[in-house]
Amino acid sequence: MTLLAAFLAAVPLAPPAQGASAQPPSPQASVRPTEPKTVAECLRAAQTYAGRRMQELRAAGQTFNWAKLSEEATDLAKQYAARFAIATVATADLTPLARLYVLAKQPGLAEQAIAKHLATPGISDAEKADALVAAVDISMGSPVSDEAVKQAEAYATRLDAVKDAGRQQIQAHSHLGGYYRGVDVDDKIFEHGNKVIALGRGLTPDDKRATATMLAGAYTNVAEVYGGWEQADKAIGILEQGVKDLESAPQAKRQIEPTLERYRLVGTVAAPIEAPRWLNAPAGTMKIDPKGTVTLVEFTAHWCTWCRRTYPSIVRLHNTWAPKGLQVIFATELYGFLGQQRALTPGQEIEGDKKYFLEEHALPFKIAIEGRRVATGPDGSTPPSTGNGDHYKVGGIPQIVVIDRQGRIRLIIVGSDPASEARLNKLVERLLAEPTT
């Protein structure tokens, strides 16, 4: 997860489809229709450079290298930042300059600019709020340390005391909530998510639309905590409330609905896991129906760091409960790459999967491998999955699903919270003790 994204991107940018590559022309080529002069203009130009350049190359039918475009954007930010000095810019320009320094990968200067702005006597509440939310974002820049998180929390507390700063407070708590979601600290996800939800209820319809992505993220984050606590009814309730609260922001509803659909699966009959290729399964296996066996399914991928962190606990779970009837299945798919290897054939990637899952991680349970989804959209997008991930409404991985002997879904967990191991052990023990009929 890129924790600095919400801070840096005035317009959200997505990396290109896997495999796109080329050496793009110089930044001076065609992406500067007018030369920016003010700090704000330079910040905007640097923030939007990579996305605008990507669009130009696509329109020209050319491929591109996103990492290279990002490097060019950093170089451009450095050029712009060098035009200004903390000692001489107007007070109102200090926070935008700090943001420009972050884009230029000069965090020390960014901190100096923010510190000067916050120390300026008589600044307005609006300026103070902007400076404090920027301070949160700068503190949470990569790499994130425990001390930096404490500092960001302190800035957010100061920001909470500023009047008429709802949008900035939402941004700060969204950033912190996103960080805790990434490292799966449930109590903190819950705390910051609920703060954002409460703040959102006081916004005007226009402000709700402007902060829709952050507001929807708060509802989904809180719901996923409830889901991991075996409280799917509360997860559904908070998501339905989110749809109602954000009715003036249709894009938020679209963001919430997939998570709502996922938790509505709890209590329903689980779909079979199907794949043309399996590891650790008898030859000819094409489908496994979980009905009749207590089953844990994890959706995973060889590139997923957070998935990898679940493997030791899932192996321990398997070793403890498989002799008593637990079935564990991993579900993944082909991606056309593995590690630094690119443009792999299905056969090559499957061999790589064997080494990764069976040798490197010594996973003893069955692993379903679906085929690769191929990009078909004009923008390089892939079509929605119609396989296992679609049946289980997978949005992010790892996603763990626990199914009882009657084939009903009893739990859905998204993420890799270390506390999940104890909860999963208790649930599996309880399900194995339930009557078989």
Task: Please provide the spans of the model-predicted regions.
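N-terminal leader/linker segments that initiate helical-solenoid repeat arrays
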Residues: 17-92
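Flexible helix-coil transition and linker loops at the boundaries of alpha-helical arrays
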Residues: 32-33, 76-90, 118-128, 157-167, ...
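Structural register within alpha-helical repeat arrays
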Residues: 45, 96-97, 135, 169, ...
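Helix-turn-helix repeat elements of alpha-solenoid scaffolds
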Residues: 62-78, 102-115, 141-154, 185-201
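N-proximal helix/coil linker or "cap" segments that precede and/or mark the start of modular domains
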Residues: 228-276, 288-291
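Short active-site neighborhood of thiol/selenol oxidoreductases, capturing the structured segment around
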Residues: 284-310, 314, 328
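Thiol/disulfide oxidoreductase modules built on the thioredoxin-like
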Residues: 289, 361-363, 369-427
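Structural microenvironment flanking redox-active thiols in thiol-disulfide oxidoreductases
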Residues: 309-363, 368-385
